[in-house]
Amino acid sequence: MINVGVFGASGRMGQAVIQALADDNEAKLGAAIVRKSSNSYGDSATENEPVHFISADELQPEQVDVLIDFSLPEALTENLKLAEQYQLPIVVCTTGLSEEQKERLAQAAETVPVLYASNTSIGIALLEQLVGISSAALPNADIEIFEAHHRHKKDGPSGTALSLGQAAAKGRQQSWDQVNDGIRADGLRSEEGIGFSVMRAADIIGEHQVTLAVAGERIEIGHRVSNRKTFADGALRAAKWLEEQAPGFYSLQDTLNLQDILQRMLKQ
């Protein structure tokens, strides 16, 4: 049985992961980690297991085998220090990370297994692959990405939307910095630019659509999430996989073995 520690355990996604663990036969909640200022601090985190909400400095290494981080970007540095100190694999699902914070992830991956996924949906992992293949096959297509989330989401474009843009650029062997148009204030696209449209409304959990358009036709590849359990299940699946890996920097695609699947299909 794998013991899982959850950062941001009192938040919406933290609670979804705790519920997923309660329904799982291979893993269980080892630690529910929150800030000491949280209203949940000290309370019971589960109904059936004697696990209470604790702060990060109260975590004991024997409590957990792997960590899942659904906390805020400002907590990342301390969370990574804890993973490094106790040599624990960590799945980082926090969105809105800066480039400096992403570099810190890569640094931590030199000593512990780190998996970074701004979106832990298996469907999104597949979508990124499809976008990369499609952009490579249609090198002259205009690419636009639309994303929609709930009204309280703070970052935009979402980390997932940016990952899709990066997948498209990689498919064309382009520099992401050179083709990223961002959210265009004037509506004008650059020659090879990849642009973004953003919606924040009501309780939308997550929608992403990538459009590849050429004269006379277009391809639209999309993904919608209707339940946060999708993300929790994906994060837990990633944590189980990561617990068995050597130190390194991994993505959700690595857990799905998509490269081998694609190579096998191409040989048929």
UniProtKB/Swiss-Prot annotation:
InterPro entries: DapB_C, DapB_N, DapB_N_CS, DHDPR_bac, NAD(P)-bd_dom_sf
Gene Ontology biological process terms, A to Z: diaminopimelate biosynthetic process; lysine biosynthetic process via diaminopimelate
First and last residue of the signal peptide: none
SUPFAM superfamilies tied to this protein: Glyceraldehyde-3-phosphate dehydrogenase-like, C-terminal domain, NAD(P)-binding Rossmann-fold domains
GO CC aspect terms: cytoplasm
Pfam families given in the database record: DapB_C, DapB_N
GO molecular function, one term: NADP binding
Catalytic activity: (S)-2,3,4,5-tetrahydrodipicolinate + NAD(+) + H2O = (2S,4S)-4-hydroxy-2,3,4,5-tetrahydrodipicolinate + NADH + H(+); (S)-2,3,4,5-tetrahydrodipicolinate + NADP(+) + H2O = (2S,4S)-4-hydroxy-2,3,4,5-tetrahydrodipicolinate + NADPH + H(+)
EC number: 1.17.1.8
Binding site for NADP(+): R35
Binding-site residues, (S)-2,3,4,5-tetrahydrodipicolinate: H150, G159, T160
Positions bound to NAD(+): G8, A9, S10, G11, R12, M13, C93, T94, T95, A117, S118, N119, T120
Keyword Cytoplasm: yes
Pathway noted in the entry: Amino-acid biosynthesis; L-lysine biosynthesis via DAP pathway; (S)-tetrahydrodipicolinate from L-aspartate: step 4/4
Active site: H149 (proton donor/acceptor), K153 (proton donor)
Family per similarity comment: Belongs to the DapB family.
Function: Catalyzes the conversion of 4-hydroxy-tetrahydrodipicolinate (HTPA) to tetrahydrodipicolinate.
Protein name: 4-hydroxy-tetrahydrodipicolinate reductase
Organism this protein belongs to: Idiomarina loihiensis (strain ATCC BAA-735 / DSM 15497 / L2-TR)
Gene name tied to this protein: dapB
